Regions:
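Oxidoreductase cofactor-interface core, primarily capturing Rossmann-like NAD(P)-dependent enzymes
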Residues: 1-17, 31-34, 41-43, 51-61, ...
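N-terminal glycine-/serine-/threonine-rich beta1-alpha1-beta2 phosphate-ribose binding loop
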Residues: 21
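Cofactor-binding loops of NAD(P)H-dependent oxidoreductases
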Residues: 28
């Protein structure tokens, strides 16, 4: 309450739904620097996240978007960022596709800004990909040992953490796990 929110969406079809929630919608692309700059100009804080719309290499796409985020922040002069990252962002290329978050964090961390990296664990919703084996075998099949414990998070819990990071800023660079 009391904050103006602008959201960059790639879909004109979502504008009415976004604005019904109380945000101002701007149609554009996170892969277009001009769209990012126009959306972020005048903002006190930016919430940035990588979407799943990569074509080709997720890591190459993420690096490109991370560089665009960095350029947009430099251009607009924003001094406070909350970035949705991922568990594993502190790891190297051996982590696989999650390495993209290491790259993005590195790019953003190089800026002289206050930034909070929000690192959620696995999403509950991703379990839907295992629904067939859950129904047929009463099991979730993964490529790690059965003794491995996995933590899951619900998007609403991530949202609460992001809102808290926006409303209660901390100076410097911080990491919050969800």
């Amino acid at each position: 309450a009391g904050h103006e929110v602008t959201l960059l969406t790639s879909s004109a079809d979502r504008v009415a739904e976004i604005e019904a929630l109380g945000a101002h919608a701007v149609v554009g692309s996170m892969t277009n620097l001009d769209d990012l700059v126009a959306t972020l100009t005048g903002a006190d804080v930016a919430y940035l996240m990588l979407t799943g719309r990569a074509t080709g290499s997720l890591v190459a796409h993420g690096e490109m978007v991370g560089n665009l985020f960095k350029q947009a922040i430099e251009t607009t002069g924003i001094k406070r960022v909350v970035n949705l990252s991922s568990v594993g962002a502190d790891q190297g290329p051996e982590i696989g596709a999650l390495y993209v978050y290491n790259i993005i964090e590195g790019l953003l961390a190089s800026l002289p800004i206050d930034i909070t990296f929000v690192r959620p664990v696995a999403f509950y919703g991703n379990l839907m990909g295992s629904i067939q084996t859950i129904k047929a075998q009463h099991a979730i099949i993964n490529n790690f040992p059965a003794s491995h414990r996995n933590a899951y998070v619900w998007p609403a819990d991530i949202a609460k953490t992001v809102v808290d990071a926006i409303l209660h800023p901390v100076a410097g660079q911080t990491v919050r796990y969800v």
